[in-house]
Amino acid sequence: MSNVKRLFVQKIFTDKEVSNLEGTWIDKSHIKLPLVKEDTDVYYNDNGIYKLLLKFRKNVISDDLIDIGWQSYKDLAKPSRGRGASAGPINSSGLYWSKRDLVDTKKWSTGYMIKGKKSKMKVNNQVASNPVGFYESSNNFSKLPCRLTHFTRCNFKKYNEGLPFIQRIDELFQELIPNAHMRQLERANLTNNFKIPNTSFSTVTINRNFRTALHRDGGDFKGGFGNLTVIERGKYHGGYTVFPQFGIGIDLRNNDFVAMDVHKWHSNTKLYETEEDKEFNSTLKSEFKDNPDIGTAGIYEKYTRLSFVCYLREKIIKCDNDNPVQSFLTSSTKRK
């Protein structure tokens, strides 16, 4: 770790200016500094005090663990219309929305007509993104208790088989940012029946070929830190993680890890194939059985970029810790 670079960056947008870009696509023109591809720590100037923005490490997750993660979780990033600003501006001419009569469309959310009536809720572009692990109680559209997420409960064997991969991410978190890890672990242990075993995480969001628009993460423990990695299949370019307020971008690839402040505005650049990439990807056997008529963004490409965002839910602390994990396998989706 002695060859780790240290970068000290300044704001090139005010907080107000960058917030005005929420929900928009960010391209590589917002990367003003050399793209981070090697071991690097980045600090930003916050009114004269330098604070940690991210720590990037190259090739720190073994191929064996990558394979475990792929086999366990590749099918768990299911279509979602609830990703908010990160799903980007509503694409009314795209395959998914062109089949629907939209109403009250504003930026990244829209309503639509169902049998002549306006939908009761507004939704976002459909992307492949779902959480595994645990969630606190919610009452958005129906009252749900603290629970295993639906896709965890339905794929509990695969979830458990992939734990060594998730646990390696937590090890890197502990190694790189020990104080934040300690705070998060102590918090997670207060409701240990709602945490992923031998980690400081309650939840992992899995995304497939999801280019995020500019957003800040919400719902995670504010005293912790964001932890990300990717698993790749095939060849592609782009997909850089960009913090436009600081002009910094990182190229997070297979085997890499980044701990980053997910409460700072961030986004991904477009994923794309070169001609060489296309030729290589044309030889790949299909791993998925997606219906191309549905129009979920990004998932019909031959290449795959699975991203994993590991965190502790802020409100999981309010859950009743008396329930053992096995009880959630039969009751986690029952309404109360």
Q: Where on the chain are the PLM-derived regions?
A:
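Short helix/loop capping segments that flank catalytic or ligand/cofactor-binding pockets
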Residues: 239, 268-269, 319-320
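Short, well-ordered beta-strand elements within core beta-sheets of diverse protein domains
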Residues: 284-285
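Short Gly/Pro-enriched loop/turn and capping motifs at secondary-structure junctions
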Residues: 236, 265-267, 314-315
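Fe(II)/2-oxoglutarate oxygenase catalytic core
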Residues: 1-224, 228, 250, 272-278, ...
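A short beta-strand-loop-beta hairpin characteristic of the jelly-roll/cupin
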Residues: 231-253
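Conserved metal-binding segment of the jelly-roll/cupin
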Residues: 250-265
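Catalytic or ion-translocation cores adjacent to nucleophile or general acid/base/metal-coordination motifs
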Residues: 244, 262-266, 277-280
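Contiguous, well-ordered alpha-helical segments that form the cores/surfaces of helical PPI scaffolds
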Residues: 223-232, 256-259
